[in-house]
Amino acid sequence: MTSHAPDPVHQFEVSRLINISIGNMDLSFTNVSFFIVATVVVSSVFLFISSSSRGLVPTRMQSVSEMAYEFVASTLRESSGVQGMQFFPLVFSLFTFILVANFIGLFPYFYTITSQIMITFSLAMLVIFTVISYGFYKHGVGFLKLFVPSGVPVLILPLVTMIEVISFFSRPISLSLRLFANMLAGHITLKVFSGFIVSMIGIGIMGVGGSILPLIMTVAITALEFLVAFLQAYVFTVLTCMYLNDAVHPGH
């Protein structure tokens, strides 16, 4: 018998857990929905427990939550100044949600919701919508200064303005694709190496010896994926703070 390696893309399929339909609308509760809820619950419980008992000697959980708090707060202050701190709840929630979602997806048989482009695109659109809404609310038409750089010769100003507009509205695409592609590629690579190990072991004693290198690679890639999971949350947060600065200081 020939054994077929598991499909590495199968882990990203969306499956219905509870069928819900209203008219022609499919509102089914899927595995993606479940892990979105799980991510929110895990994040909330962790932050509640870590912040409920504040001692002079912080626990490990308290230290982690304080490090996350200081990271987001310092990044916002450096990017947008003191005025940017009003966005702290949004940025901290995004950072925590993405980080926990990435880590949850690393456990076997768990779903990585950040490997779904619609999830990452929704998060990116939330950021851009906040920038546009606050920009017009705070500065009115003056927010459009963002698309008109100072010091540009009048002759090429229309071209530069068009480039700035395209660059601004491409931000949610690049922001979402970066997170989506990194999580997707990493999990596919893990699945391929894991499937190769199983296939080699199925061959027999010779296959067991041949599976040692893929096993080492799988362990190394898993460790790397934990680093990538943090880095992607970090990058998303830093870019979010930079974009929010455009809403606070559109003329800079």
From Swiss-Prot:
What does the sequence similarity comment in the record state about its family? Belongs to the ATPase A chain family.
What quaternary arrangement does the UniProt entry report?
A: F-type ATPases have 2 components, CF(1) - the catalytic core - and CF(0) - the membrane proton channel. CF(1) has five subunits: alpha(3), beta(3), gamma(1), delta(1), epsilon(1). CF(0) has three main subunits: a(1), b(2) and c(9-12). The alpha and beta chains form an alternating ring which encloses part of the gamma chain. CF(1) is attached to CF(0) by a central stalk formed by the gamma and epsilon chains, while a peripheral stalk is formed by the delta and b chains.
Short name of one Pfam family for this protein?
A: ATP-synt_A
Entry GO CC: plasma membrane; proton-transporting ATP synthase complex
Gene Ontology MF terms: proton-transporting ATP synthase activity, rotational mechanism
Which PROSITE patterns does this UniProt record tie to the protein? ATPASE_A
Keywords associated with the record: ATP synthesis, Cell inner membrane, Cell membrane, CF(0), Hydrogen ion transport, Ion transport, Membrane, Transmembrane, Transmembrane helix, Transport
Report what the protein is called: ATP synthase subunit a
NCBIfam families according to UniProt: ATP_synt_6_or_A, PRK05815.2-4
Functional note = Key component of the proton channel; it plays a direct role in the translocation of protons across the membrane.
Show the InterPro entries listed in the entry: ATP_synth_F0_asu (IPR000568), ATP_synth_F0_asu_AS (IPR023011), ATP_synth_F0_asu_bact/mt (IPR045083), F0_ATP_A_sf (IPR035908)
At the top level, the lineage of the source is Bacteria
Q: Which organism is it from?
A: Bartonella henselae (strain ATCC 49882 / DSM 28221 / CCUG 30454 / Houston 1) (Rochalimaea henselae)
* Protein localization: Cell inner membrane
Keyword check for Transmembrane, yes or no. Answer: yes
Q: Which residues cross the membrane?
A: 29-49, 87-107, 117-137, 146-166, 196-216, 219-239
Specify where it is mainly localized.
membrane
Give the lineage.
Bacteria, Pseudomonadati, Pseudomonadota, Alphaproteobacteria, Hyphomicrobiales
Give the membrane topology: Multi-pass membrane protein
Q: Cystine bridges: which residues? A: none
